[in-house]
Amino acid sequence: MGSSATATTTGESTRQQPGLACEECRRRKARCDRVRPKCGICADSGRNCVVLDKRSQRGPKKGQLKDLRSRLMLLEQRLVGQNDAPSLPQERDSLGCPTPSEKVSPEGDLVSSRASTDIGLDTCMGSTAGAFALFGSTSGSDKMPPLTPDLSTASTANSMAACICKGWQTEPAMFSTSPFPQIPLTPQSTTAPSRMPSISLAAADPIMPDVRVHPFAPMVHKRRYYAWASDPNASPARTALRSAMRTIASAMSPQFCDIGHVMYASTRRMLETQDACPETGLPWMTRLKPPHEQRKMHHERIQAWLLLAYYDVLRKSEHQAFITARRAFRLLRLSGLCEMDIDAYSGRQGDVATCTPPAETTWNMQMCSSENGADEAVLQQDWISVEERRRTVWSAFLLDRLSTMVNDQPTMLMEEAVTKPHACTFSWYFSADLPISNQFYTRLPMSEAEFQSGTQEPVSQMGFLIEATDGIKASNSIQPLPPFAHCVVVANLFARCMTHCKMAMQSPPMSAPEAHDFWIRHQWLASAAANACESTETRCDPMLVFTRILAYSASLSLCSTANATSWQTLDHHLMAMACKPAAHQAASEVVRIIKTAPRIAFFKMHPFFPNAIALVTSFLNADVPYLPSTRGGNAMDAIQERQDAVNELLAALRRSSQVNNLAAELLCKLELDIGQAASDGSIYG
């Protein structure tokens, strides 16, 4: 085709012909000759030759569509809110949130004066138009759009930080050494804004204690929390607890995980501000004060620190979690909550009467109960507040005991102290006949149904930790324990097993008396762990599932301890080998629980759940399996079964790693260990 010859210029030619190619040639990716009114290809194929003179750009730049959607959401919300909240601009100015003229991403402006203070979804969605404005629906349908505003950009995080953190401030140089981001704050030192940056976070307050926090830290009375959660004038301790609730919920919610670090820094700064007082700001007591001069120690502060420690486990490092947990443990000691029921215990145990708590602890306990004499009688009858303080104590105790699973951390809250100085041997420590005085003079938590109902105080009182721990050994008092109390007792038993392991690993080859003491402790712990495994059905409670897995993990730890110790006699070696059948049976039960658990259950498990799974995985991967069925059968089937069990446990860790940083770290470590062992041929060869 002569007309398709390339255009020539003086001395040079161009590959690109002048004009635009037709749509048919573009679709075929063919070279169009640009002949008008119909090019050669269209003429040969008999198709219409269509040429678009004005063509749009290749596509929007990155983030333009999300920015446009967010602006439409903001515009529709403002149009709907003109009738419901005419004073929205004034309230926005009082919050100190950035205005559109400051060129900040509009997601940070999604704050409604009404929805930010309400705690219920029903209140926030009082009308259909309000629901459309809440979810940014522009189509008129009742469905939530699949696309949500992008919360990962730096401008969005900065605007949210400005909205979150306005409202509390300290002296500029007070926390200059803090490793957390320095956020500009206002002169209110111990309060925080009641309005959060995201309308969804404020609206989701009612489900946060139920779905996110309560399954592993049931220390808050839900109805009372709902009563003051929407109060803009809440006390500093309650404001910090509310912020900590939202922080831990953001860590366990994929849609809010991007703003969790900002909320964490804000909540931690708020708690540090409250701790910066003469009574609690120093790691020692400068002088003893009478009760009327001491400040009241609110248990909500301890609860907030505990939630931040769990956030560190989920999203930060283990080391940071232990640092944060120690802040809560120290406040717990200063408050005197560990001695709440010392009078009841002293009446039942005569040897406890000689153990008097420090003067400052007694005074703090009095101040924790009431601020004046007029309110003391009323608060003594408020059994719900007393039970909430008990649950705060045991939540801290549970966190301390489960911390021993990570890197052999020592316990910070001592369970008991021996009254006689010469009786401080570890073999006496586990003896049921030992005269001991429990330092935790606090009753175990009651059942969840009785606590949350709040109608009438239960007639029967719960027992104490030492009684329940001995009850596991006797297998006679573990049955009536509610899930939370049962988890506390089993966690204490697991911590004893870990201490038993440390004592065996640190000592040189045992002599005959030392070996005798070792097996006395070992048999006591093995019997208690076996009874704990058989005591409670898992049902659908995440706390019960975790407790049972923890009890099985204790049996595995005892087996590993017995087989890792060098024995001088054949009898002791045979006793160590006899522990393997029970240990492998426990590992099989853990795998069965993991297989039958629904996928959603992994998002409700305790933050330390990955440690128990990793312990079982390491046991199956490192130890030669006890295979009674292979004596006359095929050993390869049993080895393949063990590989399938390891893969099932790794899959559970992989699911938990979506919301748990500890699970991701343990998964990476186990995969490296398994790969190295497989390459060396020491396991599956």
From Swiss-Prot:
Listed GO MF terms: DNA binding; DNA-binding transcription factor activity, RNA polymerase II-specific; zinc ion binding
GO biological process, one term: DNA-templated transcription
Alphabetized SMART domains for the sequence: GAL4
Location of the protein in the cell: Nucleus
Residue ranges, annotated region (Disordered): 1-20, 81-112
Disruption of the gene: reported phenotype: Impairs the production of sorbicillinol.
Annotated keywords: DNA-binding, Metal-binding, Nucleus, Transcription, Transcription regulation, Zinc
Pfam families: Fungal_trans, Zn_clus
GO annotations of cellular component type: nucleus
InterPro entries reported in the protein's UniProt record: TF_fung (IPR050815), Transcription_factor_dom_fun (IPR007219), Zn2-C6_fun-type_DNA-bd_sf (IPR036864), Zn2Cys6_DnaBD (IPR001138)
Compositionally biased residues, Low complexity: 1-14
Main location: nucleus
DNA-binding region: 22-49
Ranges that cross the membrane: none
Cited function: Transcription factor that acts as the main regulator of the gene cluster that mediates the biosynthesis of sorbicillinoids, a diverse group of yellow secondary metabolites that restrict growth of competing pathogenic fungi but not of bacteria.
Protein name: Sorbicillinoid biosynthetic cluster transcription factor sor4
Organism this protein belongs to: Hypocrea jecorina (strain QM6a)
